[in-house]
Amino acid sequence: AGVSAQQLRPGYVTPPSSSMLHKYVNDWVPGQELTTNYGDNGESSAWEDEEFFVSRVALKPHFVNLNTQIDKTKSDTDNKRLLFWVPINESTGVNGEWLNALPNAVFDSEVFSTWSYVTHYGNWTSPFGWVPGAMADAAHKNGVLVSGLASIPNAYLSSNWANCLAGMSAMNSDEGVKKLGNFLRYHGVDGLGYNSEYFGGGSYGEGLRGMHGKLVKYMKQYQPAFENVWYGGTNDAGSVNFNDQLSSDFYQTFGYSDEPRTILFLNYNWNSTYKLSQDASGITATGRDPRDLYMGMNMQGGLKTATEWAQHLTLPYSIGLWGAHSVNYIWINRAVNGSSDASKQATYQRDLEYWFTNGKRNPLHVMSPVNSLTATSEFMGMSRYMEARSTLSWELGTEPFVSFFNVGNGAFYNWKGEQLHVGPWYNLGVQDYMPNWRYWIATEYLGTTPAEGVDAKITWDDAYMGGSCLRITADNSGTAYLHLFKTEFEAKNNTKLTIRYKVLKGNADMSLVWSKLGSESTEAQGNYGKVFDKDGKTYSSTKPDGDVDYDADWQSKTITMTSRNKLAGTISAIGLKFENAEGLDILIGEISLTNGSYTTPTAPTVTRAKVLANNYKGIDGKVYYKMANTKEVGEPVYNLDVKTSLFRLWSRTDVDPTPKFLGTTTSWAGMIFSAPATGASKVQFGVSAVSLDYANESDIAWSEEMSTGDYVAVEDVKVSKNPVTTNEDFYVEFVDPAHAPVDWQIKDESGNVVASASSATRIDIADGLANTGSYDVVTGSGENAVERKGVISVSDPG
């Protein structure tokens, strides 16, 4: 039997069961790995993949500075929150494998990146009480809570879910809540999410509600926020009541000011005078923050929207976005501008900016609410309702600020400008900090008038680190400011601000700009910020001393901040200034702030490794490792605790001992894809830890030697031409050059065999196909037959 192309496949990583959270919590012993998994009916099996569901990045707090907001009158208590309650990526792959946000060798994977307009990402297809570590790492660095989902069907409780809720209710004690809370803390989960539209459970509903209140209180001792998410279907009595309002039959579930229990996501028909009056009464009665009430918006459509979007402008409540069950409605529409991976990814990032910033991709544009739930150039965006949030405030001596504008996927992997790996990859956990406002472009620094002629976007054409970078085009004879990061970093003597860039064409006067806390609207860089001028001269200090390299090499400028040059101080925002721009096309590969040197991490300790597949692309496998640390047993251990930004993954074989770089991860378990192994019988997987400033790394820690395993043919096929026109010759062949000869059939849409071949590795259609339409390809025979739908598309020549 064969397999599909080299990527995440069934059995590579096994997720936990959604309805068995109570069993995992009861089994968990702090400091010991969970080694038992459960099916939905409670049957147990061996498990080795817990580490893929552990976050290694602590939840960072947001900070508030009204002076670096677009609307400087909007206080934090007026700033709406946003619950993005949707799936991420495809929920399952073509072979039934569980995908979600697990690392993969697929470029066209979802790299959500507009975190500054989201406060809680409820991963709709992640198990109850669990989230993939890679997703949690990306969310946590941006201050965004994450949760999985109790995906309870819309019906009476099934036995597995009844047992689960009863088990969770039984944790309503100080000891029970402590163990549950420590379990969630260790794994990096920031709340429990419920698709609560079920009948029943009244007998243990009181215990479940009490547990929620105690859990919130317990968790807030350790992190800035924690939220249990409840869908406004099942009420306090265990009945389904979609009344779209905070009525008294939800008060106990919602909780009171002295014991908040959940945030409440209201069903979609909430916009009536009576229902809104009930909401106001409910907030008064419970004493809760009105932002803990989320007015649901169904991204699938089918409901009125223009009046709801307008109503959101007047209400004190937060916004909840849902849609849909297996894939979200921003991700699903990414192929409208082309089918290539790069095109789909570019469209997806643009649509994120349409949805969360606005249709003009600049929050300075105040756009009117529209009758739409679709990302378009007319959409008013979530920035109409809230200010972009930021976590960029910590001690630079402990942790540097570094962004390479790597979103977490690509068709290659560059390391410090050198392409070390060619091939598709995806790991959301290694995503860098993205520009907070996406994109605040103004005629003045922190100004309110939009500047024209300047555009910014993510590109996958090049990268300094990873698979992407920021691309800026500018054609503006005036002045334009692109504001990148809202910060509160103290620049001390000898703090260094670095920009790394590559000029593709054109010219401009370009400067790094920033301001200081207390004088936010005043540029602080003086002449030190100049990077290059319109005459093609570069500046390492305040005077031109070099030339712009138009031969596609990365260049850099580092500014040392001192009290003597009056640059030291608390930096409140960082951006770029463009003057006299003519056809400028530039890539930004790094913006960083460092304060001194950072410790080189110790090498990881590999605990085990496993070969998963061997085919024409190489070896797939996984490797698990630990980092020495001084944390108490059972306490979360973050990468910052072990002085590590991320881990590099490697392989080597018995015939080629040179380490081969395969990718990076923030997790303490790594997926290995396509490790080179030509002619090898033994393989090792390795991992090294990279310092916080990316300047140094540990030695590579290696697994024991493993057999490369039996070679398994890949069943994917490719068509020599696409599309094919009628009566045009073409052929179909295996992508795997080592595939054994098999029988072939081409079938039309009615199932008729229109061409065949025997014992071959390809089928030639010398005279083409006479009729337009879609054709299937079948290889093999009997129980070994593999049928692929719609592989061939035939159209008229015109």
Where are the model-predicted features located?
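Extracellular fibronectin type III
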Residues: D693-Y711, N784-D796
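Extra-cytoplasmic beta-strand recognition segments
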Residues: L470, Y481-V513, K557-S563, I591
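Chitinase-like catalytic core of GlcNAc-active glycosidases
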Residues: K74-S277
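Beta-strand-rich modules
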Residues: F673-E697, L769-N784
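Short carbohydrate-recognition loop motifs
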Residues: G453-Y481
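N-terminal module-boundary/linker segments of secreted carbohydrate-active enzymes
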Residues: S4-W115, Q221
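Conserved aromatic anchor
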Residues: G618-D641, F730-P737
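Extracellular beta-strand ligand-recognition surfaces/modules
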Residues: I499, D553-I591
